[in-house]
């Protein structure tokens, strides 16, 4: 591989924010946060869903609206979404 053109491929801790589950894998993701895990310091990437919380893997259906997506959509597109056109 050519030096200097590839991103840094390193071990990163991914943390599922819905249940706190953490796992280490290698990634090129850029993060500002770090975490101490098993005696070492790793970059931390926070994710909303992982295999520990996704309904496909857990077998439990769960409604997740952690970011308030519906309200955010209504605030942004309220008049247009209801069929009314503002003039």
Curated annotation (Swiss-Prot):
GO cellular component, one term: ribosome
Annotated SUPFAM superfamilies: L28p-like
InterPro entries cross-referenced by the UniProt entry: Ribosomal_bL28/bL31-like_sf, Ribosomal_bL31, Ribosomal_bL31_B, Ribosomal_bL31_sf
Alphabetical list of Gene3D superfamilies matching this protein: Ribosomal protein L31
Alphabetically ordered keywords of this record: Ribonucleoprotein, Ribosomal protein
Single GO BP term: translation
Membership in a protein family: Belongs to the bacterial ribosomal protein bL31 family. Type B subfamily.
Protein name in UniProt: Large ribosomal subunit protein bL31B
